[in-house]
């Protein structure tokens, strides 16, 4: 075990701390879900249109969860004027089948694209491609947010990348793409539905064209109204670009559901068993001080099934927990960091032996075709003469290499530290895991603030100490600012706002969300990793 059992008082304090973090997260998310606010929502309704979130709620099956990702994107930028970057993305169940959904939020700057909108849509498309599931686009966008065009239009991962992914899904991967034009769809954005398999347009409220009436008048001198230029009637009866006309939003969404009923049935689900411990107690597991130890088993026994949990090499390199288990009946391989003092070692650190242990375990999971779930609380690799003498660099490379080349699904849950190269080795985002989730307690960054202070100022501080001089106020302020900056940068919400994880989640939802994500990954037949496959398409 990684620490002694906590007292009742400690449990109460821990639960109160986590509850505070979750309530703060919920308040922020509730505000972001309002989009442009009540007045903009009323304007959308007055135009005879549902909001993006109302459309999604109507589209997915009743009493099923919409697993949203990217909700916090750009929340702390643009003076709060770009909630969720003006687009709602996530996974929903439509007629029993999992699908990615991308819905422009027209209450936010008329659904215009911000610089952060592009990577958010690309991430949604990558999830569809990586997991081989359909994608639905609910289009209601004024196009590029022109004052920010330099961060939207050009570049390898600019707006054009969306259409590149459209083309790959349509021509190479043969993934169903359904586009519903439920408002404006202007300029280059019109290629998104045009590169989909099915295009539905809504009478009177939809428009699709490479240029709107104002642009057409400026370019050609021709005066024409929006409906005549690119409305549902023109594109269904004259141009033939669209395939179906819907009377209103509700009818449009019903037509999408009808299309899904024609798709192959989803995989069957195995019979699950309950976790060994109730999820209600999960708030009391992590200490408020991120540096203190706790029992990682108290996390795992609340998320994974009680049956068939078998730890691999429990007495060898115990700072890394490797186990086979089940998640709602599905076989999984689990890799987690143990935190605390495991004499003579320190938990949360990857040593030479633990790196090789994990590498072998990943290879075993790969041979068996078992998905891997990483539970991250890692401070990095061990350093020093002994570690270098034992070949920590080579062992770490083996751990990274086996993880990188694994073709089985990989899902990451960060519950505390995700620091240094250890973050990379534990299937960090740069290694294309299928999904990445974080608790509000997650701390994602190259190092902690105290470590950064030592790296930046230790030489200067040592010099002052030797000379017996006091620390100048300017230096003291710089040190305080460094610590404050790192606290902000390490925060899970900061990471999520920049797309460094798919979502920050309530710990009590961990089992449900990981199950949804896992079942989505099971749609994809085993193959080479997506990063390699993309290079050969």
State the predicted function of each range.
Residues 1-537:
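Ligand-binding clefts of soluble mixed alpha/beta catalytic domains
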């Amino acid at each position: 075990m990684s620490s002694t059992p906590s007292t009742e008082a400690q449990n109460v304090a821990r639960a109160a701390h986590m509850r505070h973090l979750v309530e703060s997260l919920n308040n922020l998310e509730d505000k972001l879900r309002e989009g442009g606010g009540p007045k903009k929502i009323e304007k959308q309704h007055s135009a005879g249109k549902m909001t993006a979130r109302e459309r999604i709620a109507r589209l997915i099956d009743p009493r099923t969860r919409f697993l949203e990702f990217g909700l916090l994107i750009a929340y702390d930028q643009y003076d709060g004027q770009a909630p969720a970057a003006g687009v709602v993305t996530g996974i929903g169940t439509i007629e029993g089948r999992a699908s990615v959904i991308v819905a422009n939020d027209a209450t936010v700057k008329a659904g215009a694209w911000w610089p952060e909108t592009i990577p958010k849509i690309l991430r949604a498309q990558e999830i569809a491609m990586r997991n081989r599931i359909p994608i639905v686009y609910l289009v209601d966008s004024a196009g590029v947010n022109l004052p920010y065009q330099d961060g939207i239009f050009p570049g390898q991962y600019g707006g054009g990348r969306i259409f590149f992914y459209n083309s790959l899904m349509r021509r190479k991967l043969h993934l169903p793409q359904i586009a519903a034009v439920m408002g404006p769809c202007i300029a280059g954005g019109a290629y998104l539905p045009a590169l989909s398999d099915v295009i539905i347009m809504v009478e009177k409220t939809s428009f699709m064209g490479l240029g709107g009436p104002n642009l057409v008048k400026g370019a050609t001198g021709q005066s024409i109204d929006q409906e005549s230029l690119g409305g549902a009637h023109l594109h269904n009866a004259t141009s033939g670009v669209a395939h179906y006309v819907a009377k209103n939003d509700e009818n449009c969404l019903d037509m999408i559901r009808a299309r899904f009923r024609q798709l192959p049935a989803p995989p069957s689900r195995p019979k699950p068993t309950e976790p060994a411990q109730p999820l209600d107690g999960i708030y009391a597991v992590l200490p408020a001080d991120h540096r203190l130890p706790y029992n990682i088993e108290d996390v795992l026994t609340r998320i994974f099934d009680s049956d068939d949990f078998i730890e691999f090499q429990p007495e060898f390199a115990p700072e890394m927990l490797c186990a086979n288990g089940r998640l709602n009946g599905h076989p999984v391989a689990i890799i987690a960091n143990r935190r605390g003092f495991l004499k003579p070692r320190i938990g949360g650190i990857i040593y030479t032996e633990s790196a090789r242990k994990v590498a072998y375990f990943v290879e075993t999971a790969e041979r068996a075709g078992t998905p891997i779930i990483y539970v991250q609380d890692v401070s990095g690799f061990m350093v020093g003469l002994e570690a270098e003498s034992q070949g920590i660099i080579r062992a770490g490379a083996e751990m990274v290499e086996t993880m990188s080349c694994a073709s089985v699904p990989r899902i990451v849950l960060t519950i505390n530290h995700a620091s240094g190269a250890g973050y990379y080795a534990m299937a960090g985002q740069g290694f294309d895991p299928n999904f990445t989730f974080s608790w509000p307690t997650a701390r994602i960054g190259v190092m902690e603030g105290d470590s950064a202070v030592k790296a930046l100022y230790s030489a200067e501080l040592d010099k002052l100490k030797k000379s017996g001089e006091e620390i100048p106020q300017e230096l003291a302020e710089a040190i305080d600012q460094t610590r404050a900056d790192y606290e902000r940068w390490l925060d899970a919400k900061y990471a999520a706002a920049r797309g460094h994880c798919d979502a920050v989640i309530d710990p009590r939802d961990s089992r449900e969300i990981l199950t949804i994500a896992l079942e989505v990954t099971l749609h994809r037949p085993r193959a080479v990793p997506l990063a390699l496959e993309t290079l050969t398409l």
